[in-house]
Amino acid sequence: APDDDDKIVGGYECPKHAAPWTVSLNVGYHFCGGSLIAPGWVVSAAHCYQRRIQVRLGEHDISANEGDETYIDSSMVIRHPNYSGYDLDNDIMLIKLSKPAALNRNVDLISLPTGCAYAGEMCLISGWGNTMDGAVSGDQLQCLDAPVLSDAECKGAYPGMITNNMMCVGYMEGGKDSCQGDSGGPVVCNGMLQGIVSWGYGCAERDHPGVYTRVCHYVSWIHETIASV
């Protein structure tokens, strides 16, 4: 099975609260990222599913109490009904918060996309995953600027494994990527949430860019799900 892709390599420490939509999913420890898309709702990857999750908002250094954090428990965790643990198709889930988050400069929403990302568009990926393959996670939020790759490049890197609901973001030459620990976290292009960190082979390896859930295919599912609960 593909590795869950969960740490940023070759990026930089985000300026504090530069990506205030980025949240940490916690079950006694940080295990995945997510994105705040409404005061009461977070989107993440379905492979990050846990029945109960504490969502930590306004975080920068997840090992320290910096005074800006808000912790809110989940009241519902909803995986996409067509999620496949086999090929990670439809790797998206929604987390309903037990109370809406208060928005401020540390905690803010990211817009859902109005269209799909295009090849070559530059995006910001943020997360707390490991900074070296197999190493411990970085405690400060890491950022990476990376381009959306073409479908041809993506399918060429992972023959037979890329569905229409996936896209590759990153560098074919390797050295910069998201990895274990960033899973579920955001890919933001032009102010819109276009990707969710999903999977990849290894981390920052040549010819194996990160694979991301294509959020633009799920906007109606997100709206319908939020409206129905």
UniProtKB/Swiss-Prot annotation:
Reaction(s) catalysed by this chain's protein: Preferential cleavage: Arg-|-Xaa, Lys-|-Xaa
InterPro entries to which the protein is assigned, alphabetical: Peptidase_S1_PA (IPR009003), Peptidase_S1_PA_chymotrypsin (IPR043504), Peptidase_S1A (IPR001314), Serine_Proteases_S1 (IPR050127), Trypsin_dom (IPR001254), TRYPSIN_HIS (IPR018114), TRYPSIN_SER (IPR033116)
GO-annotated molecular function: metal ion binding; serine-type endopeptidase activity
Co-factor note (free text): Binds 1 Ca(2+) ion per subunit.
Catalytic site: 47 (charge relay system), 91 (charge relay system), 183 (charge relay system)
Main location: secreted
Entry similarity comment: Belongs to the peptidase S1 family.
Protein name according to UniProt: Trypsin
Organism of derivation: Squalus acanthias (Spiny dogfish)
